[in-house]
From Swiss-Prot:
Record-level GO BP terms: cellular response to acidic pH; cellular response to magnesium starvation; negative regulation of protein catabolic process
Organism the protein comes from: Escherichia coli (strain K12)
GO molecular function annotations of the record: anti-sigma factor antagonist activity
One Gene Ontology cellular component: cytoplasm
Main location: cytoplasm
Protein name as annotated: Anti-adapter protein IraM
Induction: By magnesium and calcium starvation, via the transcriptional regulator PhoP.
Amino acid sequence: MKWIVIDTVIQPTCGISFSAIWGNMKMIIWYQSTIFLPPGSIFTPVKSGIILKDKEYPITIYHIAPFNKDLWSLLKSSQECPPGESKITNKCLHNSCIIKICPYGLK
């Protein structure tokens, strides 16, 4: 089954992410990974992680739940990344970020 990413919230210091996705219904997945699932990406879950753009990536999926608008709003409001100051300097202020490539193009 293919899943389409609608939106993603990341916590850069621990690699925890939440994505609103569409499969056979709208869901929220809670996972940990060193990759970013940008909106519009299409992936297939497999036993060892996911397949994204014909490449397998390890991720740990902790929980999948039906989409809840209030929960998603809460997750979005507590998002650490990108911090507002970074938009001005183009530099990431998270010295301990474990995401390999910044999804926001920061350095």
